[in-house]
């Protein structure tokens, strides 16, 4: 059976693409970075999907070719890598596109480059000399956490660098999971990726409020004032709680979802496909509800984490977690009963080794149902009857670990036609050393000698709507107060709802004082009851935008983070809010801001909506040593898409496994 055009590349297809690239470069060293599905041009795919949804698809129907995007370095005799991209038709085993990426761009990092950094640090006399300035207690060893270099300063030579954040770990605990972040060291070695040499060791300041940006105030006993702060249960001095009873998710008749072709999901009138790639992680495609098209594609496009400590080299501290290393590359192997509960379907991914060979990533995505409280309810006080349904959701989830931080991403589908994109931030704060007894305006002291720097986490979700078809418009709805008027508003209670259709690509920001709402509508189809165009809506999350000065490198390379909503006209391959190449970038290139600058018409056409939101994270002590989840939800809801509440037919069955607690659980309290 031929794979669906949206199915991820199989291991066999990945290896075919690899072999085609190797054949194109005989007697040359090829260092592979990524091989994954190059999604078909939208026009081709829509033709195929039309046949599929109409039931007219046959073995002889035209199909888009299976294309593999291959990213790799070609290393010649001069040992200087040339970053190149090719597209391979795995069906014909031919290379159909090829380009050499400009030297102004850097390929996303690989874990092998991080391994090299650690190895070279410990072998470097320069690093060992810097380390000799500190007296570490007996039993402590140095740990190096590799990090992207960040945005190059304008005066720096445009070479590829990596840096390491240094910590110490207490080996006397005999536990490899002991929290080394509790013991930060003020050393940051920098490696030239080409020569693989440590070219310098930056020495950040450790002072407090009122001290200079570069003042060296540390003592040789650099971690003598730091404290143990462990999070693994076996190292918790008080142990874990003993009064927590099990809470099980039980589905005795199995799940309500159905999976076919290892990518097609059907559940409660929803129909969509799940895919995965090394850049975005899990992506959602061809979303329909009850036989009607809703979305063409949904993904987490980018996120950036800029830090607010101006002391060098922290001014460069800014990660693009999807562009720099790839959200999919950093995905967890999800664990049953921990990461996901209930009756679970796992989806595997196929990734690429340094030699280009395919390797399976098991359990990259989990799919499960969950109860999220009441769906709808009404009590008729006249009859005493209450009708209530539960709000069940289908969750598509993946989790990524990026050094110290974890991010949990979930696409949630509900029975009333709603879609929620949820992100959760957890993990461990990125911390630096601070002198004993001092505080800082650049962050918060969360433990002895440990400063958690102020920073932001800014996400961008890409929404490609297909509201009853591919041609849509975007409306901005606002609710405005109206002054009292003796004729039109004599009592002052009236407010006016204004709706404007965007004419050109552009951007705007959340406005909670106006309840500013984004509506993605089909202008050719009206709701028979309201007479408004059918659509889906969301209210932009009113979170703080990027705080860095607009002229700073931080801001110039993350222009997508400067506004809450962007609206662009669709172009094939235009998927990444921060641009295709973010590693060491100095400005955003070919990102959403450039797409807006084209000034395309966005009326009754193929539009894309980008929603930016996040957290300004000024750390608190309670975030240490591991951070409770911070939750953000972008709620995409039907707006005059249906003729009534689409979940009216959800059964109001009573859950027979629920029971009342006995008197031994609930006793009278004495105050």
From Swiss-Prot:
One of its GO terms (molecular function) is copper ion binding. Its cofactor is Cu cation; Zn(2+); L-topaquinone; Mn(2+). Keywords: Copper, Disulfide bond, Glycoprotein, Manganese, Metal-binding, Oxidoreductase, TPQ. Mn(2+) binds at residues 464, 606. Cu cation binds at residues 455, 457, 617. InterPro entries: Cu_Am_ox_TPQ-bd, Cu_amine_oxidase, Cu_amine_oxidase_C, Cu_amine_oxidase_C_sf, Cu_amine_oxidase_N-reg. Binds 1 copper ion per subunit. Can also use zinc ion as cofactor. Contains 1 topaquinone per subunit. Substrate binds at residues 319-330, 402-407. Residues 3-106 are annotated as: N2. Residues 107-211 are annotated as: N3. Gene3D superfamilies: 3.10.450.40, Copper amine oxidase, catalytic domain. Glycans are attached at residue 471. Induction: By N-butylamine. One of its GO terms (biological process) is amine metabolic process. Its EC number is 1.4.3.22. It comes from the Eukaryota. Homodimer. This is Copper amine oxidase 1. The gene is AO-I.
């Amino acid at each position: 059976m031929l794979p669906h055009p949206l199915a991820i590349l199989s291991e066999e297809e990945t290896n075919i693409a690899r072999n085609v690239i190797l054949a194109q470069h005989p007697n040359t060293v090829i260092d592979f970075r990524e091989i994954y599905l190059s999604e078909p041009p939208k026009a081709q795919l829509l033709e195929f999907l039309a046949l599929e949804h109409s039931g007219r698809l046959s073995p002889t129907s035209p199909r888009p070719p299976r294309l593999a995007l291959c990213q790799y370095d070609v290393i010649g005799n001069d040992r200087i890598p040339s970053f190149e991209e090719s597209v391979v038709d795995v069906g014909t085993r031919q290379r159909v596109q090829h380009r050499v990426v400009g030297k102004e761009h850097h390929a996303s990092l690989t874990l092998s480059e991080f391994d090299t950094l650690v190895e070279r640090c410990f072998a470097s006399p320069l690093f060992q000399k810097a380390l000799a300035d500190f007296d570490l207690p007996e039993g402590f060893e140095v740990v190096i956490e590799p990090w992207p270099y960040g945005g190059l300063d304008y005066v720096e030579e445009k070479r590829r660098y990596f840096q390491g954040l240094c910590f110490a770990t207490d080996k006397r605990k005999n536990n490899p999971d002991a929290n080394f972040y509790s013991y930060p060291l003020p050393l940051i070695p920098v490696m030239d990726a080409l020569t693989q040499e440590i070219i310098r060791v930056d020495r950040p300041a450790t002072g407090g409020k009122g001290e200079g940006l570069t003042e060296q105030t540390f003592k040789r006993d650099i971690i003598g004032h730091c404290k143990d702060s462990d999070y693994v249960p076996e190292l918790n001095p008080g142990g874990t709680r003993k009064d927590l009873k099990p809470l099980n998710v039980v589905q005795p008749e199995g799940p309500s979802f159905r999976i076919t072709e290892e990518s097609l999901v059907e559940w409660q009138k929803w129909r969509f496909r799940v895919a995965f790639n090394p850049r975005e992680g899990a992506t959602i495609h061809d979303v329909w509800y009850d036989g009607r098209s809703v979305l063409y594609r949904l993904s987490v496009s980018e996120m950036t984490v800029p830090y607010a400590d101006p002391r060098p080299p922290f001014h460069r501290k800014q990660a693009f977690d999807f562009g720099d290393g790839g959200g999919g590359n950093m995905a967890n192997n999800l664990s049953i009963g921990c990461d996901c509960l209930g009756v679970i379907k796992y989806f595997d991914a196929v990734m690429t080794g340094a030699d280009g060979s395919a390797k399976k990533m098991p359990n990259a995505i989990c799919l499960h149902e969950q109860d999220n409280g009441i769906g709808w309810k009404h009590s008729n006080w006249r009859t005493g009857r209450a009708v209530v349904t539960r709000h069940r959701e289908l969750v598509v989830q993946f989790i990524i670990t990026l050094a110290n931080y974890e991010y949990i991403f979930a696409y949630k589908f509900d029975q009333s036609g709603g879609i929620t994109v949820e992100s959760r931030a957890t993990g461990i704060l990125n911390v630096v050393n601070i002198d004993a007894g001092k505080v800082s305006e650049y962050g918060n002291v969360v433990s002895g000698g440990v400063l958690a720097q102020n920073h932001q986490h800014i996400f961008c979700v890409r929404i490609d709507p297909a509201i009853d078809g591919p041609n849509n418009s975007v409306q901005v709805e606002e609710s405005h107060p109206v002054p009292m008027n003796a004729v039109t508003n004599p009592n002052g209670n009236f407010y006016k709802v204004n709706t404007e259709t965007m004419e050109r690509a552009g951007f705007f920001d959340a406005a909670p004082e106006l309840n500013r709402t984004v509506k993605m509508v089909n202008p050719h189809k009206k709701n028979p009851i309201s007479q408004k165009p059918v659509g889906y809506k969301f209210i932009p999350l009113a979170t703080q935008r990027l705080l860095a000065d607009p002229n700073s490198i931080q801001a110039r390379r993350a222009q997508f983070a400067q506004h809450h909503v962007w609206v662009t006209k669709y172009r094939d391959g235009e998927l990444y809010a921060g641009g295709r190449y973010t590693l060491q970038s100095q400005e955003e290139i070919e990102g959403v801001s450039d797409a807006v600058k084209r000034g395309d018409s966005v009326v009754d056409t193929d539009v894309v909506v980008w929603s930016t939101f996040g957290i300004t994270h000024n750390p608190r002590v309670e975030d240490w040593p591991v951070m409770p989840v911070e939750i953000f939800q972008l709620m995409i809801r039907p707006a005059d898409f249906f003729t009534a509440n689409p979940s009216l037919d959800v059964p109001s069955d009573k859950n027979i496994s629920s029971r009342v607690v006995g008197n031994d659980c609930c006793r009278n309290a004495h105050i």
